[in-house]
Amino acid sequence: MAGQRTYREKRPVREGSPAALHPAEFAKDREYVDVLRWHHVGLSSRFLAASDGDLYGIDLVLAGVMVRSYGLVDGFLDAFDTWNPVVAAPLLRMQLDNLVRVSYMVQAPSASDVADHFVVGGEFRNLKDGDGKLLTDARLLHHAKEHHPWVAPVYEATSGWVHFSPTHVQAAMRLHRDEDGRALVDRLFQ
């Protein structure tokens, strides 16, 4: 069994992984995701050191997001390296949950009130935005789209991986064409 790695240790590209087998398409982006993973630590240190070390509700929420995000990126790399989209896609969707919640919090009329509500155990879905609408996932996406126009289609595409759906059935099949161009379906596990 391999020893535990440190949080800043570079994650080598595994033999047989998509980045190893298709380096032109995946190696650079995979390395970038790994760099983003360990940048979480430095970024967290910087924002937690602001305000002369005093901590506020916003700091606690952001620290929680950073720990969750680090774990999601770390897990994504493992799933990607082992060709496991059934795990990788929901992790990406969970990362989008982080994004839409932080995006709303920082643009809310009172970010401190949102953070304080969350720190004591409240949920975003029980809060209302400036228009008096509950902060459902759809509403959070609405607010995030202003700054992240790409978020809605990615959120939608990855949502199919969270709950059992036709996406999983399609992932269990291998689609290809025969020599005459007819579509064929093979089971993944034969």
What are the roles of these predicted feature ranges?
Residues 6, 31, 154, 160-162, ...:
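Intrinsically disordered, low-complexity N-terminal regions enriched in serine/proline/glycine
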Residues 65-71:
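Helix-boundary capping/turn motifs
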